[in-house]
Amino acid sequence: MRGVTALLPRRAAVRAPYWDTIRYLSGTLVLFGHLVDTLHDREGLVWLYLATWPLRVPVFALVAGWFSSAAPLTRDAARQVALTLLLPYLIVGFLHSAQQWWLTGRWWFYVDSPAWGAWFLLALPVWRLALPWLARLRRPVVWAVAAALVAGYVPWIGGWLALSRTLCFLPFFLLGWKLRQGAYAAALRPGVVWSGRAAVAVLAGAGVLAWCVRRQVDYDWLGMAQAYDSAGGPAIRAAVLLAGVVGALALLRLMPRRRIPVVSWLGAGGMYVYVLHPLVLRPLLHEGGVAWARSWPEQASVVVLACVLSAGLASAPVRRVTWWIVRPARAGAAAR
């Protein structure tokens, strides 16, 4: 039961500031990515979008895996999965439908085709249900990578039930679970000099590489939501998965274990940032979004805007008002 409820950030007697900080950083970067992912001609924003991709959904999936158990689901545990993940998925889908109707006059209820960003709520229960069986494999992460690569050859695996993304981000979920079992523990331990230097080099290298390829990268490669459209598709996806793993591990190694004022506290609302931000961004983007950001100072102000929006969504007042969307099964206690 513990592994199920921990799939989402939860209120506990003693919170882990390390994971809360990671949640908040990752959620903020997801919000930033969705705010700017249509601005392909703003070099600064494109660079930051590419450089931080490994720290967004790959990290969210990894954290979910860390807090998951490979124990078989009981009936009560399966019910809890449905209430904590599938019910929010339906609620969020309805809210997205209503918002789209309000903005465009068109109605579309998101069920088999997840609403913007909501695919993660569908993937989590699938990963959790599959974990007891996947854990029996000798090298589950390797098998998951193979499944992610094969998925690109199946045309009908795409947006339907987010199957492509569910398969393609499964390696990160399983990696998180393996880390909880002790994998790479020595390298990720604070104070290990060589791994700390390697992590700094990885993130610095990601920044340099992102700048060098900022005009060549197709954002669809990072989303991994569709079938391959070229012969080089499998190699590109393998490179994306590798970059995600290396970048996520680098973040885990460098993140301070101690509580960071304000940031760690906001991290308790990390899932609120992830679930709610599309509902906040859609009206903004409908009116032009941040297309005004052209100069470098203006592009920097977009980053500040993303941080402000993320802080607001993760704040206690917002959690008290919106608990019924993100965590309906736990009522208002989760937002206190």
Model-identified regions with their sequence ranges:
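Alpha-helical transmembrane segments and their immediate juxtamembrane cytosolic regions
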Residues: 2-336
